[in-house]
Amino acid sequence: MRLKVGLLGGGSWGTTVAAVVSRNAPIQLWARDAETVEGINRDHENRKYLPGITLPPALGATSDMAEVVAGADVLVMAVPSHSFRSVLEEARDHIRPWVPVISLTKGLELASGKRMTELIEDVLPGHPVGVLTGPNLAREIMAGQAAASVLSMADEIVVRALQPLFHSGLFRVYTNTDLLGCELGGVLKNIIAIAVGMGDGLGAGDNTRAGLMTRGLAEITRLGVAMGGRPETFAGLTGMGDLIATCTSPLSRNRHVGVELGKGRPIDAIIAGMNMVAEGVKSAPTVMALADRHGIAMPIARDVFDVTQGKRTAMDVFRGLLKSSVGDEAHPG
């Protein structure tokens, strides 16, 4: 029996994953925006988020959530963190028991500090939960360029059963049972990407970028391990791999925010000019709260938090780097 997949969310990444899955299984995408739905069904294009890219004819879309959720053997969540819980609550009345729910969202709930898989467990108890995450830039994948990702679930049997749904051609999908570590890597790298972008916006060089990425990965790993993740996870695709892609690609939303901050633009103006969400800006306050709760020093992430909150400028932060004391490489700072 072929599994039917329902995907909630009509953004660039959700549309990309839906296109990949459509090669392996029947899939239907839900989006609130009527123009997005019409464009996918009539023209096989998501003009708002993936203009100029032709989608597979097998991919259909609808604004009827009940239709998508009720018929799904697997449900994929591709909505921003700020609306994740409310969309789950809408879906709750229509989902069948024990249907696996996979998150594509790399963020935290602002009010609770919870990861998206924790929200799934809150709203849909008893459903297997997982994430698809890694160094995955939507436009590159839609252009047919090779990429690797990770499907992570706590249950090894379930994750291996679902792996073939997402693995397709040059889009290679590995499995990992460290759900917490994989999910946190995708969240935390966004903040480091903003820091790297600030350096790029200020005209810093490759040495600065390499230093920020390396020290940033150390911060990610320290917090991730303190929260229960496995150290090796953060050296893999969902940690270092995702960090490299997000910190270096001109397609990265979080890096773009950092670049504009480095140029001196205010955060509100930057966000207002984007039609997609930069999760790192929203996650920064929650990540700082988690770091404080676990007693983990994250100086780079804290600098990003200060700048995105308007407490300091990118120039102030980078000047401060030159004045901070240094010690053993294994220590924070």
Swiss-Prot record:
Gene Ontology MF terms: glycerol-3-phosphate dehydrogenase [NAD(P)+] activity; NAD binding
Entry binding sites for NADPH: S12, W13, R32, K106, A138, R253, V277, E279
Catalytic class of the enzyme: oxidoreductase
Pathway as given in its UniProt record: Membrane lipid metabolism; glycerophospholipid metabolism
Active site: K189
Keywords associated with the record: Cytoplasm, Lipid biosynthesis, Lipid metabolism, NAD, NADP, Nucleotide-binding, Oxidoreductase, Phospholipid biosynthesis, Phospholipid metabolism
Localization: Cytoplasm
Cellular component GO terms, alphabetical: cytosol
Signal peptide (residue range): none
PROSITE patterns linked to this entry: NAD_G3PDH
GO BP: any one term: carbohydrate metabolic process
Binding residues annotated for sn-glycerol 3-phosphate, in chain numbering: K106, G134, K189, D242, S252, R253, N254
NCBIfam families in alphabetical order: PRK00094.1-2 (NF000940), PRK00094.1-4 (NF000942), PRK12439.1 (NF009098)
Similarity-based family: Belongs to the NAD-dependent glycerol-3-phosphate dehydrogenase family.
Function: Catalyzes the reduction of the glycolytic intermediate dihydroxyacetone phosphate (DHAP) to sn-glycerol 3-phosphate (G3P), the key precursor for phospholipid synthesis.
Protein name as it appears in the record: Glycerol-3-phosphate dehydrogenase [NAD(P)+] 2
Lineage: Bacteria, Pseudomonadati, Pseudomonadota, Alphaproteobacteria, Sphingomonadales
